[in-house]
From Swiss-Prot:
Name of the protein this chain belongs to: Movement protein
GO biological process: transport of virus in host, cell to cell
Organism: Odontoglossum ringspot virus (isolate Korean Cy) (ORSV-Cy)
Source taxonomy: Viruses, Riboviria, Orthornavirae, Kitrinoviricota, Alsuviricetes
Molecular function terms from GO: RNA binding
Homology family: Belongs to the tobamovirus movement protein family.
């Protein structure tokens, strides 16, 4: 029905690199952003140069402007614009703060639903990172989403995040903007996953027993099947896979043990597997063997 325009914040606010200038954010979001609500940096990470820590920078990047023309819209959004990423590294979307303001008179009916989407995920419930619902009578609103997960730099450069909006009950002519939204993301850029992968603290290790950790980082469906059983099942399935038959090994034919024994005993009838012809040319023997004859695979059995 109406046109929905997203007016997004254009600002960059470096946290870790103190030598760079800091730019002031819009007043709408200035009091809403608290880095400590999303991430906790240690004293070493705050004071040491980025070259000596896993965390390279913590930034609030500038965001693109998005314009929507219909009630239901799904638009790409660049939450990392202006952020210097690390090649072959990672970026963590620690949080997202959204502030909206209705461009309507007081006591208007209707409302809006806003959702942050990861378009890589095929299942809708897994692609939804967070959502918010509000009515048009609430002139200004602010909410935050904490995705708190990392993606590779290569994936981040493809623009994997989207914003879905759904406006209902707002009676406005086409070509006008009923709602303005500002997006500010908090992201952490780092070179490797080791730091974030060592969150667990080992409490107890016994010989032949499981390792006891303080944090459950494995999904429930994985915990139901021990990894040793998974490995055994995986190997057994691979061994049962049929291999391609080969009639020749190093240019020589292979006879099965039964036919070979009959041949050595002077029996001219070698069963159903009969050598029809031998043609020698350029050192290669062309021997035709029936399908019932055993064959050998010259490929390695290792995997």
């Amino acid at each position: 029905m109406g046109r929905l325009r997203f007016v997004v914040l254009l600002s960059i606010f470096p946290i870790k690199t103190f030598s760079e200038p800091c730019y002031t954010m819009a007043l709408v979001l200035r009091d809403s952003i608290k880095i400590s609500e999303f991430i906790n940096l240690s004293a070493f990470e705050k004071l040491l140069p980025s070259a000596l820590t896993a965390v390279k920078s913590v930034r609030i990047p500038k965001v693109d402007k998005i314009i929507s023309y219909e009630n239901d819209t799904l638009s790409d959004i660049d939450l990392l614009k202006g952020v210097k990423l690390v090649e072959n590294g990672y970026v963590c979307l620690a949080g997202l703060v959204v502030t909206g303001e209705w461009n309507l008179p007081d006591n208007c009916k209707g409302g809006v639903s806003i959702c942050l989407v990861d378009k890589r995920m095929k299942r809708a419930n897994e692609a939804t990172l967070g959502s918010y619902h509000t009515s048009a009578c609430k002139k200004r609103f602010t909410f935050k989403i904490i995705p708190n997960y990392s993606v590779t730099t290569a994936d981040a450069l493809k623009g994997i995040w989207q914003v879905m909006t759904n406006i209902r009950g707002v009676e406005m002519e086409k070509g006008f903007c009923p709602l303005s939204l500002e997006f500010v993301s908090i992201c952490v850029v780092y070179l490797n996953n080791i730091k974030l992968g060592l969150r667990e603290k080992i409490l107890n290790v016994t010989e032949g027993g499981p390792t006891e950790l303080t944090e459950a980082v494995v999904d429930r469906f994985v915990e139901k099947v021990p990894m040793a059983a998974r490995l055994k099942s995986f190997r057994s399935v691979n061994k049962k896979k049929p291999s391609n038959s080969s009639k020749f090994v190093n240019g020589k034919s292979r006879l099965n043990s039964r036919n070979k024994l009959n041949y050595e005993n002077g029996d001219s009838d070698v069963g159903t597997s009969v050598v029809d012809d031998i043609v020698v040319g350029n050192g290669v023997s062309d021997i035709r063997i029936d399908d019932d004859c055993e064959s050998f695979d010259a490929q390695s059995e290792s995997y």
